[in-house]
Amino acid sequence: MTVRILAVCGNGQGSSMIMKMKVDQFLTQSNIDHTVNSCAVGEYKSELSGADIIIASTHIAGEITVTGNKYVVGVRNMLSPADFGPKLLEVIKAHFPQDVK
C-alpha cells in the first residue's frame, strides 16, 4: 500500500504546489512509499477519497474535517522539512507502518 498525502493551501496554486514538492522529496529521502497531490482548502472534500493524510498550515488545518482512517497534520512552516517532517513521519509510522521501507 502507498500512503497518500494531500497538500492543502488557501488557493491551491502556490504554497500547496511547493509543499507537494517538498513533501515528495522528504518522503522519498525517508524511504516512504507515497503519492502527493495538492489542492485548495475549498476543494479538499472532493479530494478526500484519494488521501490518507492531509497536510496544511496550522491556520487552515483547523478548517479541515476528516473521519475514519484519515489524518490532518497542521504545520507552521509548510516549506520546511524540519517543521513538517517529524510530524508527518509520526503519523505515517503510527498509522501506515507498512509504507516505511
Curated annotation (Swiss-Prot):
Known EC number: 2.7.1.194
Catalytic reaction(s) noted: N(pros)-phospho-L-histidyl-[protein] + L-ascorbate(out) = L-ascorbate 6-phosphate(in) + L-histidyl-[protein]
Single GO molecular function: kinase activity
InterPro entries membership: PTS_EIIB-like_sf, PTS_EIIB_2, PTS_EIIB_2/3
Gene3D superfamilies, alphabetized: 3.40.50.2300
Pfam families named among the record's database cross-references: PTS_IIB (PF02302)
PTS EIIB type-2 domain residues: 3-96
Positions of transmembrane segments: none
Induction of expression: Induced by L-ascorbate. Repressed by UlaR.
PROSITE patterns: PTS_EIIB_TYPE_2
Intracellular or extracellular location(s): Cytoplasm
Active-site residues from the entry: C9
Alphabetically ordered keywords of this record: Cytoplasm, Kinase, Phosphoprotein, Phosphotransferase system, Transferase, Transport
Record-level GO BP terms: phosphoenolpyruvate-dependent sugar phosphotransferase system
GO cellular component, one term: cytoplasm
Positions where Phosphocysteine occurs in the chain: C9
Free-text comment about domains: The PTS EIIB type-2 domain is phosphorylated by phospho-EIIA on a cysteinyl residue. Then, it transfers the phosphoryl group to the sugar substrate concomitantly with the sugar uptake processed by the PTS EIIC type-2 domain.
Role, per record: The phosphoenolpyruvate-dependent sugar phosphotransferase system (sugar PTS), a major carbohydrate active transport system, catalyzes the phosphorylation of incoming sugar substrates concomitantly with their translocation across the cell membrane. The enzyme II UlaABC PTS system is involved in ascorbate transport.
NCBIfam families the record matches: PRK10222.1
Full protein name: Ascorbate-specific PTS system EIIB component
Natural source organism: Shigella flexneri
